[in-house]
From Swiss-Prot:
Name of protein: Glycerol-3-phosphate dehydrogenase 1-like protein
Keyword rRNA-binding attached: no
Protein source organism: Mus musculus
Localization per record: Cytoplasm
Gene label: Gpd1l
Catalytic residue list: 206
């Protein structure tokens, strides 16, 4: 007898979550391995007097977070988290990283023991020994195997089906290949590697570098300066991974889409860069700019810089990571944006 088709639930429905829902909803229609209905947990909000879940289920568009892109009709928005994940075999986590503890606590025990997860969440947490990855939190709280997906993937471009690459990191290769089958399309090409921790760390740390790039744009420094931010940021990303990742760190992973490609696209086209540029030019706070420019969605770069700053301070390593440190101090300690240039001029890479 053929195995029952695998039920998929997407946990999250923001900009990126909705773009991924478009891919998965379309793919499962022709893949017999997966159930043809995809549930998507939606944090209920009211938009123009209507519930967001009603809009998605009737008009098949997330008008708040991914306007202008139709979702397949087999993607069903569910406002109740427990109901959304019930009996799901495959969980796709795509929420702001600061909510992962609460979400895991709420759904642990409600999914089958053999369920598999993949996290698209770009962020890290602080643990007693320093670094704690989002995948570690999910694995420890829920007891399921978890893969990661990171890459040069601006959500609106993915939703518009413009060509891009991405990277899946999975410690169990067959699980990574299963998620590749679920997610790959002719215009969304996936490489699977086993260096999962490095893949995940790239996705978090590049947002800090992008904030630095945005500061430089706000100061009108030019392309040469931004190239230096990208290079020095990459050096700090590699150094951080080699210090804090428990397993082996392959430098080759930084050449995958999750590494240098994602870093470049985020430093030129992402929301972290855009908000950081506005921060440098307007003097408004990050919180004000989130409301103004991001429809209230949370920016990951500044928050990740705060977590990284605490981890580095705990280990006495702040002076080894001047770019990461400068981003935190400018965002949260009121240091002038020009400190970004000072940190580049005196970077230990040049000494």
């Amino acid at each position: 007898m053929a195995a029952a088709p695998l039920k998929v639930c997407i946990v999250g429905s923001g900009n990126w979550g909705s773009a991924v829902a478009k891919i998965i909803g379309s793919n499962v229609k022709t893949l017999q391995k997966f159930s043809s209905t995809v549930k998507m947990w939606v944090f209920e909000e009211t938009v123009n007097g209507r519930k967001l879940t009603d809009i998605i289920n009737n008009d098949h568009e997330n008008v708040k977070y991914l306007p202008g892109h139709k979702l397949p009709e087999n993607v069903v928005a569910v406002p109740n988290l427990s109901e959304a994940v019930q009996d799901a075999d495959l969980l796709v986590f795509v929420i702001p990283h600061q909510f992962i503890h609460k979400i895991c606590d709420e759904i642990t025990g409600r999914v089958p023991e053999k369920a598999l997860g993949i996290t698209l969440i770009k962020g890290i947490d602080e643990g007693p020994d320093g670094l704690k990855l989002i995948s570690d939190i999910i694995r420890e709280k829920m007891g399921i195997d978890i893969s990661v997906l990171m890459g040069a993937n601006i959500a609106s471009e993915v939703a518009a089906e413009k060509f891009c690459e991405t990277t899946i990191g999975s410690k169990v290769m067959q699980n990574g290949l299963l998620f590749k089958e679920l997610l790959q399309t002719p215009n969304f090409r996936i490489t699977v590697v086993d260096d999962a921790d490095t893949v995940e760390l790239c996705g978090a740390l590049k947002n800090i570098v992008a904030v630095g790039a945005g500061f430089c744009d706000g100061l009108r420094c030019g392309d040469n300066t931004k190239a230096a931010v990208i290079r020095l940021g990459l050096m700090e990303m590699i150094a951080f991974a080699k210090i804090f990742c428990k397993g082996q760190v392959s430098t080759a992973t930084f050449l995958e889409s999750c590494g240098v490609a994602d870093l470049i696209t985020t430093c030129y086209g992402g929301r972290n860069r855009r908000v950081a540029e506005a921060f440098a030019r307007t003097g408004k706070t990050i919180e004000e700019l989130e409301k103004e420019l991001l429809n209230g969605q949370k920016l990951q770069g500044p928050q990740t810089s705060a977590e990284v700053y605490r981890i580095l301070r705990q280990k006495g390593l702040l002076d080894k990571f001047p770019l990461f440190t400068a981003v935190y101090q400018i965002c949260y300690e009121g240091r002038p944006v020009t400190q970004m240039l000072s940190c580049l001029q005196s970077h230990p890479e040049h000494i």
